[in-house]
Amino acid sequence: MHRIAIYSIGKKDEKCYEAIYEDLIKNSKKFALIETKNVFNKKINAAQSDAQKAMKAYSDTFKPFILSDGFNIALDPEGKCLDSFAFANLLKEHTKLAFFIGGAYGLERSFVQSCDMALSLSPLTMSHKIAKMVLLEQLFRGLSIIHNHPYHK
């Protein structure tokens, strides 16, 4: 059974997104325990007018969630792009994972480099809410590929 945590910068998700997230997590339940956590604090709020300060605040907030006994993946536009089969292979190799989705300014280079991998979901820019949705869908698809579930045809 996979254990997957997804951390993203932000306050509570809107209901329209939350319903989709919950559906994808529910579909993945037989293969993985997936937890999502939005993080937002005073330091992040105070730093929003300065990109460098904001990225530092995101990194400082995420650091306690880095897994010492798992595989840490930073979502980053300069990260590696994988197709669904390569992503499934990544899931096959690692059963305990943490994904980090930055805020509006992305993540500090030093934080990205401290992770085991930088992953790009697409060359397109997308909001962290859409990125989380795409990630959850690809997690379900990858787990379906591994377990020969008919979702991925």
Swiss-Prot record:
What are the UniProt keywords, alphabetically? Cytoplasm, Methyltransferase, rRNA processing, S-adenosyl-L-methionine, Transferase
- Please state which protein family the record places this protein in: Belongs to the RNA methyltransferase RlmH family.
Quaternary structure annotation from Swiss-Prot or TrEMBL: Homodimer.
Which InterPro entries does the entry mention?
Alpha/beta_knot_MTases, RlmH-like, tRNA_m1G_MTases_N
Function in brief = Specifically methylates the pseudouridine at position 1915 (m3Psi1915) in 23S rRNA.
Q: What EC number(s) does the entry state?
A: 2.1.1.177
Q: Which gene name belongs to this protein? A: rlmH
Q: For this protein, what reaction is catalysed? A: pseudouridine(1915) in 23S rRNA + S-adenosyl-L-methionine = N(3)-methylpseudouridine(1915) in 23S rRNA + S-adenosyl-L-homocysteine + H(+)
Q: Where in the cell is it found?
A: Cytoplasm
Write down the Pfam families for this protein, in alphabetical order: SPOUT_MTase
Query: Which protein is depicted?
Result: Ribosomal RNA large subunit methyltransferase H
Organism of provenance: Nitratiruptor sp. (strain SB155-2)
Residues annotated for S-adenosyl-L-methionine binding in this entry: 75, 102, 121-126
On whether Signal is a keyword of this UniProt record, the answer is: no
Kindly list the GO CC terms recorded for this protein: cytoplasm
Q: Has keyword NAD?
A: no
Q: Name one GO molecular function term.
A: rRNA (pseudouridine-N3-)-methyltransferase activity
Q: Which SUPFAM superfamilies match?
A: alpha/beta knot
